[in-house]
Amino acid sequence: MIAKSSSKKKSKKVITDGIAHIHATFNNTIVMITDRHGNTVCWATSGGSGFRGSRKSTPFAAQVAAGSCGEKALAFGMKNLEVHVKGPGPGRDSAIRGLNAQGLKIQSITDVTPIPHNGCRPSKKRRV
């Protein structure tokens, strides 16, 4: 007889405070919620929320993605969020509204868009 391997069921940890990282590009919006140490709790994208093509880059798609990510975070017992927004995309503000609509308390909003201090040379100009 083969012995059954006893595996314990993984219990979900209760995380009350977290950080929401919103990466808004011109083509997509990625919402990722981490705990205070940077470990990923849940994530969602506007492309993964059922939007394809040019509709993926709309503010409404970002709001839906942030809402679904907020639902997943509530399942972990999350209540308070700090929001870090990165990028120039159209889904910046509406993603914050989507998180707020789920009942998560937003404590602070920080813009962490990387800005070069005259670093690398940009690529050549497009000629259409």
Swiss-Prot record:
It comes from the Bacteria. One of its GO terms (biological process) is translation. Pfam families: Ribosomal_S11. Keywords: Ribonucleoprotein, Ribosomal protein, RNA-binding, rRNA-binding. One of its GO terms (cellular component) is ribonucleoprotein complex. GO terms for molecular function: rRNA binding; structural constituent of ribosome. Part of the 30S ribosomal subunit. Interacts with proteins S7 and S18. Binds to IF-3. Located on the platform of the 30S subunit, it bridges several disparate RNA helices of the 16S rRNA. Forms part of the Shine-Dalgarno cleft in the 70S ribosome. PANTHER family: 40S RIBOSOMAL PROTEIN S14/30S RIBOSOMAL PROTEIN S11. Belongs to the universal ribosomal protein uS11 family. This is Small ribosomal subunit protein uS11. It comes from Vesicomyosocius okutanii subsp. Calyptogena okutanii (strain HA).
